[in-house]
Amino acid sequence: MDPSQNPNIVHATTIISVRRGGHVAVAGDGQVTLGHTVMKGNARKVRRLGREGQVLAGFAGAAADAFTLFELFEAKLDKHGQLTRAAVELAKDWRTERRLGKLEALLAVADKETSLIISGTGDVIEPEDGIIAIGSGGSYALSAARALLAHTELDAKTIATEAINIAGDICIYTNRNVVVEEL
């Protein structure tokens, strides 16, 4: 949903996950927008999950739905202990439990080996190039990350940070207050 379509929903952000040199970084901006108004500039939308913080996760979308999706995924991760298995089990729940309905949110999750997008409709998608970019500035961040990967020797954390900064310069729903985690 375009952030401007419903001015009463808190949403819009940019999250990116980048892999390089055996490392993965997930970065996100800090802006929370309600309709056309910036409500907060320093939100933390990227976190470590799992027993030992072995999974990185970032969320984009309607805030309440994103927190619900986070909680559901984290419960599956705690139960199964493995990223792909937790994502698949969460997707199975969508097919069997009507109460989950449709959440207007996306998660970008990554561990040392795998990167996945988990949608609020129960879809699990693994990107073919190891880059995930979601949210209102996702296209800008994805373009920046691909260019930096192809034409520089920068590490994953630096590329993720710069991709969010570039998106923040272009997308009105994204700022340059970057939070980044790396494995």
Swiss-Prot record:
Documented activity regulation: Allosterically activated by HslU binding.
Alphabetical keyword list: Allosteric enzyme, Cytoplasm, Hydrolase, Metal-binding, Protease, Sodium, Threonine protease
Disulphide linkage map: none
UniProt main location, coarse: cytoplasm
Entry's transmembrane regions: none
GO terms of biological process kind: proteolysis involved in protein catabolic process
Annotated signal sequence range: none
Metal-binding among keywords: yes
GO annotations of cellular component type: HslUV protease complex; proteasome core complex
GO molecular function, one term: threonine-type endopeptidase activity
Quaternary data: A double ring-shaped homohexamer of HslV is capped on each side by a ring-shaped HslU homohexamer. The assembly of the HslU/HslV complex is dependent on binding of ATP.
Family, as annotated: Belongs to the peptidase T1B family. HslV subfamily.
Entry protein name: ATP-dependent protease subunit HslV
Species this protein is from: Xanthomonas euvesicatoria pv. vesicatoria (strain 85-10)
Species lineage: Bacteria, Pseudomonadati, Pseudomonadota, Gammaproteobacteria, Lysobacterales
